[in-house]
Amino acid sequence: MNVFQMRDKLKARLKHLDVEFKFDREEETLRIVRIDNHKGVTIKLNAIVAKYEEQKEKIIDEICYYVEEAIAQMGDEVINNVEDIQIMPVIRATSFDKETKEGHAFVLTEHTAETNIYYALDLGKSYRLIDENMLQTLNLTAQQVKEMSLFNVRKLECRYSTDEVKGNIFYFINTNDGYDASRILNTSFLNHIQHQCEGEMLVGVPHQDVLILADIRNKTGYDVMAHLTMEFFTKGLVPITSLSFGYDNGHLEPIFILGKNNKQKRDPNVIQRLEANRKKFKKD
């Protein structure tokens, strides 16, 4: 599968939409825009091709679902009742776009050296990032949006699965509600986990649909955490960062873990077992 074949495959799957496809050969991207208002999304084809080698049709299904929902929500809808809206925070990499294609700046807050907090209008099956222009429609200030989002993220259930590797404990939150990584902002929950830790607590948000917490009790744990975050980072539809964060009473500090030349620590079976555990938890 190459980028041209992927382009054609996506166009065939999405031909029922009232959209226009724009292929950029140099950037290897496919932009899909609504015909009525020219709003749309851009897909990086080379990244999807890489994921296709392992995930096959699953990644195609996910991309098509994402595009269909995004295009549907980009209609010029009118928000009539602010009491009915749900605003949530979402975590993005610092390299993520700072403004819309129309030039409207997104409402955002600096979070760490690796991450920023954006704010989203929850639309049920998807959400729309809030920009400064939308604030007028919502009749809200940026500060009100931030306060509402933090209040709402604290109400989310923080159900997790656990696994132990060489004496180190790993916690996984993977509800696929779009806000798994956002739970990193629930300081009360993170402090609760820290009180259970016997070693150093690390936190990972490799992509938007997973939050990894770790109780690192020996050197092997650092290497496993580094592998985990990189593994999830490469598989996520919305990757954030492959780095981990040290956590202590509300403070997050990005750390870079140097892998050791130790086959036992780098055993791929460990990563596969943790991934299988996560998938089992998802089904439950």
UniProtKB/Swiss-Prot annotation:
InterPro entries: DUF1444. It holds the Pfam family DUF1444. Belongs to the UPF0354 family. This is UPF0354 protein SERP1303. It comes from Staphylococcus epidermidis (strain ATCC 35984 / DSM 28319 / BCRC 17069 / CCUG 31568 / BM 3577 / RP62A).
